[in-house]
């Protein structure tokens, strides 16, 4: 069984990753991964994409057909266009309803497995010391503070350990995001400098002669 210290740290790490990446982005990634599995929902999504391609092809042909010069062809394409549009709207509504249910399920699972466990562990292991402080190294008020609310005096409580993990991980995440943003900005500025036109040597010489 993994140590409670490690369990708490991993949970806090997952929470920080979710906050940094974003719940919507995670839902989108899981949704795409789920659609790659051969399920009825994946089949439904594939049918919708295929129907959308058919609709766009008919719409393109309809726009290219004159209603005055080729009325019969235009009327046939119009009926086909309206039929495909109706079928596409139905399939799109069905997929969107499935996506809404999927997002609710993923959100509930993520909340229970992160925030729910995050709240449950201090209630269940509130009296259990995470580790003990060296005896006599810290004054009484420090020992009382780190053992708050129910851990034995002189030990570090699970609440304090959670707060310490959250603070450290937040600093690390902010530092990583800042470094990545700096690298990205440096690359973009480098590309912009490369795109700037450099004056030709002949043009410079011509300007010099004119000045003379």
UniProtKB/Swiss-Prot annotation:
The chain crosses the membrane at residues 5-24, 111-131, 156-172. GO terms for biological process: tail-anchored membrane protein insertion into ER membrane. GO terms for molecular function: protein-membrane adaptor activity. Residues 25-110, 173-212 are cytoplasmic. It is found in: Endoplasmic reticulum membrane. GO terms for cellular component: endoplasmic reticulum membrane; GET complex. Residues 1-4, 132-155 are lumenal. Keywords: Coiled coil, Endoplasmic reticulum, Membrane, Transmembrane, Transmembrane helix, Transport. Residues 188-212 are annotated as: Disordered. Residues 72-100 form a coiled coil. It comes from the Eukaryota. InterPro entries: Get1, Get1_fungi, Helix_hairpin_bin_sf. It is a multi-pass membrane protein. Interacts with GET3. Required for the post-translational delivery of tail-anchored (TA) proteins to the endoplasmic reticulum. Acts as a membrane receptor for soluble GET3, which recognizes and selectively binds the transmembrane domain of TA proteins in the cytosol. Belongs to the WRB/GET1 family. HAMAP family: Get1. This is Protein GET1. It comes from Chaetomium globosum (strain ATCC 6205 / CBS 148.51 / DSM 1962 / NBRC 6347 / NRRL 1970) (Soil fungus). The lineage of its organism: Eukaryota, Fungi, Dikarya, Ascomycota, Pezizomycotina.
